[in-house]
Amino acid sequence: MDDGHQESALYDGHYEGDFWLFNNSSDNSQENKRFLKFKEVFLPCVYLVVFVFGLLGNSLVLIIYIFYQKLRTLTDVFLLNLPLADLVFVCTLPFWAYAGTYEWVFGTVMCKTLRGMYTMNFYVSMLTLTCITVDRFIVVVQATKAFNRQAKWKIWGQVICLLIWVVSLLVSLPQIIYGHVQDIDKLICQYHSEEISTMVLVIQMTLGFFLPLLTMILCYSGIIKTLLHARNFQKHKSLKIIFLVVAVFLLTQTPFNLAMLIQSTSWEYYTITSFKYAIVVTEAIAYFRACLNPVLYAFVGLKFRKNVWKLMKDIGCLSHLGVSSQWKSSEDSSKTCSASHNVETTSMFQL
């Protein structure tokens, strides 16, 4: 087996290469067999967990924004685009879970389509997170200008979201073009192209990690500086949520991207079993971003939580729980508190 084919057989991470990690049929050692067994059980389980919670959370966000919450601001536009991308992303996972347990039985067209959908929506999600960060910076740090231009910026938000989808589709084309089904002990849907593998890795690391990370550092630094000068009882809550957003991004995305970066420096890392485990586990951690986004970017908003209660009331959940009056009291209290918020803090939480 030549080096190019061996790499195709060994490495298949969703973010860069082929779907099946280190699936080398020529390596029959007990250590490698244990790793393959672990991967074939662990990854499908993770995919299904992320699928279930991601489907529920992102579907709820979409329902609220479509039926209960009008798109009045630029933030609303981005917060609609984010769950849409994450929802399509998680809907590809059951196919990979089945293929991980058995083999790829869905054909070449579905292989290309699902690889393209998976990659495109990953980029859409990460670029939308970047736009949300910039939007929050503008709204909090330049509150007066932001308030006066919300209607105009809403239109720009729709244009930006369209551009995000177009750019994400373009950078996903290698997955569609070079995705194919190959028989290596069993049928697998994989992607490999030595000619552009380095370019794909650079684009992936830039758009999927470094750009969002750098944007978060710069924008949230400005937001924190502004909030520290604000005299408002919600200031500390604002800072906690900012730190939570950054911490979740770092904890879920840094390990896998760091492992990918290290692995790209030497072929030896492709053959080290402990590093194979590291890639699989950190990749699984990165997937949980799709479950956490609804919590971080929607559920923290007072307006969103109120609309969730309205949805529950409409479908008859609250009448059996006897909490309508309790929610009414809480809602009135929230309105009183909201009236005392300054522009910065209101902009931060009225998502």
Curated annotation (Swiss-Prot):
GO terms for cellular component: plasma membrane. It is a multi-pass membrane protein. The keyword Disulfide bond applies. Disulfide bonds join C111-C189. Residues 69-77, 135-152, 225-240, 303-351 are cytoplasmic. PANTHER family: C-X-C CHEMOKINE RECEPTOR TYPE 6, CELL ADHESION MOLECULE. This is C-X-C chemokine receptor type 6. It comes from Mus musculus. The gene is Cxcr6.
